[in-house]
Design a protein with these regions (language model features):
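Eukaryote-biased feature marking scaffold/signaling PDZ-domain proteins and nuclear chromatin regulators
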Residues: 11, 56-58, 72, 79, ...
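Eukaryotic short linear interaction motifs
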Residues: 23-27, 67-75, 121-123, 131-133
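Short coil/turn segments at secondary-structure boundaries
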Residues: 29-32, 76-80, 126-129
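Charge-rich, low-complexity intrinsically disordered linkers/tails
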Residues: 1-57, 66, 151-195
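Conserved catalytic cores of phosphodiester-cleaving nucleases, focusing on short active-site segments
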Residues: 16, 57-68, 83-84, 88
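Structured partner-binding subdomains within large eukaryotic complex subunits
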Residues: 101-195
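Short secondary-structure capping micro-motifs at structural edges
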Residues: 2-4, 44-49, 69-72, 98-102, ...
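Acidic, metal/cofactor-coordinating or nucleic-acid-engaging core segments within structured domains
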Residues: 68-105
């Protein structure tokens, strides 16, 4: 997430992440976002961009193994996912704050994460609690399980969940983001004239 305004010193680098391509937005929407993105090619930072090709990420996955990380492998993956998805949730909150609609995203799940190792999976939903100008970020555990139990009975559970995020949740989330972008004023100019 090398174009995202950092939360702390280290920028997240999830094993896998999903967001929206630049081309997912109309030319008019990209123009409205442009003042808040800057020149992404030269490395300007933005709340709305994770990388130069991904806007508004909504899913990350981290894979860790006990061999490399010890018994705390999943905890490490959870922390990395929490960092990545805090930036993702913050992006949506800041967009909605710009158009005075932040109440619509208060306490709503705005991103998901999957942490796993060679036998266990943890799935979380990430959301913000907005109290005036203060925003706090949280995660809600959706499911934790061992996919090797019961002769692999749960081996497709994460796939089915992720497919549901793509097919059901994501289109609604995208429409919500687009509706906020459409309310941004056109042709904002942040240039400061010389004295």
């Amino acid at each position: 997430m090398n174009n995202s305004i950092p939360l702390v010193g280290t920028r997240p680098q999830p094993d896998y992440s999903v967001g929206f391509k630049r081309e997912a937005f109309t030319e008019e929407q990209r123009e409205k976002l442009a003042p808040f993105i800057g020149d992404f090619i030269t490395g300007d930072w933005s709340y709305f961009m994770a990388t130069h090709y991904m806007y508004f990420p909504f899913l990350t996955c981290e894979v860790k193994c006990e061999v490399m990380c010890g018994a705390a492998a999943l905890d490490i993956a959870d922390r990395k996912n929490a960092h990545s998805m805090t930036l993702a949730v913050r992006a949506v909150v800041e967009l909605f704050r710009l158009v005075k609609r932040e109440k619509e995203v208060n306490r709503e799940i705005l991103a998901f994460s999957v942490s796993h190792d060679h036998r266990s999976v943890r799935i979380y939903g990430h959301y913000a609690v907005i109290d005036g100008s203060k925003t706090s970020f949280y995660r809600h555990p959706i499911r934790a399980f061992e996919f090797t139990d019961l002769d692999g009975k749960e081996k497709w559970t994460t796939y089915k969940f992720t497919k549901s995020v793509y097919d059901t949740w994501m289109p609604t989330h995208f429409k919500r983001i687009c509706s906020a972008i459409n309310e941004l004023p056109s042709k904002i100019n942040f240039d400061v004239s010389p004295l």
